[in-house]
């Protein structure tokens, strides 16, 4: 489906809606901001929307709440990694965004990168790090600088830019404190881009690319969400042909992972103009600093209209009629 300005969506047709926010991950604070923004947008359009925080409320209450569909505004583990999607499949409650497998794949950076590489999509070279890894050998193979990060965290949490070999151990330990799997990837020196995608399969399409200009090129957790020093360029100022190339790469990355509904591809652009995929976010931020609403606005779509269309596309991996029912 194409996302449009001023969609004709009857709020009553959406039924009773749960907005899942907060949760238990390291990105809880951002999820609360996203979820409250989504909740306010839905209520402003007359939707019968209610907050639900899995970090504070037992899952039994989710099952008993009588939601007809849910908007997943959770970020990170237990919300973006396939676990919540699997629970909602079991409950037969349609939900926004990607299904169980695509969510799990996209949350795991090494699985994502291996799949993209198999399909010939450009992504930085990488190695998995463990306590007994020969870090000097990794540096010799991949070169410096390197990015060391947890394989299953987002929002740059636990990430370190390593510029000297003797920094590897500390960078590994920082990331390993958050995830048993740690990834080191070649640092791409160039422009940071992001590109939202909406739809599914052959109907998937990219929204405008955003170019990110962060203070001292450091687009970390603080600069992503809590400062006004980062510049976001949308239109991206890229040449038209390069903008189209980045959009096409983002859409193909989305399709290869089996994503649906909406997502956001993060991309690095080398100084000679070659785009490299970094990761796919299947439950993007919807805060005041978030990028998907910005790209939507560039297409003439308000925050509220975008949220309504994401919610209207809520579905299940398995059609409700296919769910097994006891005799």
Curated annotation (Swiss-Prot):
Cofactor: Mg(2+); Mn(2+)
Subcellular localization(s) per the UniProt record: Cytoplasm
Pathway: Cell wall biogenesis; peptidoglycan biosynthesis
SUPFAM superfamilies cross-referenced by the UniProt entry: Glutathione synthetase ATP-binding domain-like (SSF56059), PreATP-grasp domain (SSF52440)
Family under the similarity heading: Belongs to the D-alanine--D-alanine ligase family.
Protein task: Cell wall formation.
Record-given protein name: D-alanine--D-alanine ligase
Species the sequence originates in: Cupriavidus metallidurans (strain ATCC 43123 / DSM 2839 / NBRC 102507 / CH34)
């Amino acid at each position: 489906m194409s996302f449009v300005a001023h969609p004709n969506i009857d709020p009553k047709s959406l039924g009773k809606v749960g907005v899942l926010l907060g949760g238990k991950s390291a990105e809880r604070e951002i999820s609360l901001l996203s979820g409250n923004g989504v909740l306010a947008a839905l209520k402003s359009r007359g939707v019968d929307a209610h907050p639900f925080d899995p970090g504070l409320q037992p899952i039994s209450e989710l099952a008993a709440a009588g939601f007809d569909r849910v908007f997943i505004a959770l970020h990170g583990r237990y919300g973006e990694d396939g676990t919540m999607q699997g629970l909602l499949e079991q409950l037969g409650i349609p939900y926004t965004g990607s299904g169980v497998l695509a969510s799990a794949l996209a949350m795991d950076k090494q699985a994502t990168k291996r799949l993209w590489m198999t399909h010939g999509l450009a992504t930085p070279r990488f190695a998995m790090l463990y306590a007994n890894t020969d870090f000097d050998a990794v540096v010799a193979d991949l070169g410096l600088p390197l990015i060391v990060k947890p394989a299953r965290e987002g929002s740059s949490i636990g990430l370190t830019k390593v510029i000297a070999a003797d920094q590897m151990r500390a960078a590994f330990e920082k990331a390993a404190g958050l995830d048993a799997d740690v990834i080191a990837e070649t640092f791409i020196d160039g422009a940071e881009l992001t590109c939202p995608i909406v739809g599914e399969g052959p109907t998937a399409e990219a929204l405008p690319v955003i170019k990110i200009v962060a203070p001292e090129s450091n687009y970390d957790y603080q600069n992503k969400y809590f400062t006004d020093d980062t510049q976001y360029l949308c239109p991206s100022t890229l040449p038209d042909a390069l903008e189209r190339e980045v959009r096409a790469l983002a859409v193909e990355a989305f399709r290869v992972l089996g994503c649906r509904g909406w997502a956001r591809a993060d991309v690095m652009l080398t100084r000679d103009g070659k785009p490299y995929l970094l990761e796919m976010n299947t439950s993007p931020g919807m805060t005041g600093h978030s990028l998907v609403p910005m790209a939507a606005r560039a297409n003439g779509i308000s925050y509220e209209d975008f949220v309504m269309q994401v919610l209207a596309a809520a579905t299940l991996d398995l059609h409700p009629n296919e769910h097994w029912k006891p005799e």
